[in-house]
Amino acid sequence: MDFVFMLTRNDATVENALDLVEVARRLALKHIGFKDVGAETAKLRRLTAAIREAGAAVWMEVVSTSRDDELRSIALARDLGVDWLMGGVHAEEGLRILSGSAIRYLPFAGRPCGHPTVLDGAPAEVEAHCRAFAAMGCAGVDILAYRATEAEPLDLVAACRRGFSPPGTVVVAGSINSADRIAAVRAAGADAFTIGTAAIEAFYAPGAGPLEAQLKAILADCRAAE
């Protein structure tokens, strides 16, 4: 299972994101990402370059709440040349914007709302969304399982796996804050998970120390979940 370190707090890219990339570089993290909100385009360009220089895949998650802002962010992701694009709800339009690029697109399943984002929707709806995404040609799905308002988190992860068979990628984003949750989402069928705030604020592993120690703890728990 893959760990995607998000340079974010409360669903926005943090001001010192470039400094955090240097910490991640020391640990040879393979996946590093940011949100489409919280930083200007010029900074996102610098972040994309820095992540690539660190030897990691570049991830971007779209959390903008309006259709127009979402589609602008998808176009920006194409311009930046990220490797993975998560989020957004207008999958057909997103795929058209990304057509011809190598970007792997994982839209939200369920009904995300607000910012920071929460997730409405039952497992049957999430599974149906995933089947539709697979038929469209999406690379996978982004599920805010632990932000759910209408279902048990692991039921949503399992619904994604039923609806999107391998090699489709199921990524659990948001509120992964313990080894137990990493192991649980893996058992439910997830291929990857994201952590931002819990690492940056140093409450993933209380008492372990600042960011580098937090990331080491997450990596160890990720390996243990395999």
Model region roles, listed by residue range:
Residues 45, 120-128, 151-158, 208-214:
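Charged helix-capping and loop-helix junction motifs
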Residues 67-79, 83, 121-128, 155, ...:
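Catalytic cores of alpha/beta
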Residues 55, 63, 67-149, 163, ...:
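Conserved anion-binding
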Residues 41-44, 70, 91-96, 153, ...:
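Short, well-ordered alpha-helical microsegments
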Residues 3-8, 30-34, 58-62, 84-87, ...:
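Hydrophobic faces of well-ordered beta-strands that scaffold small-molecule active sites
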Residues 24, 51, 98, 161-164:
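A generic structural signal for well-ordered alpha-helical segments
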Residues 80-93, 136-150, 175-181, 186-211:
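Glycine-rich phosphate-binding active-site loops on the catalytic face of alpha/beta enzymes
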Residues 1-59, 65-68, 74-81, 131-136, ...:
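Conserved N-terminal beta1-alpha1 strand-loop-helix module at the mouth
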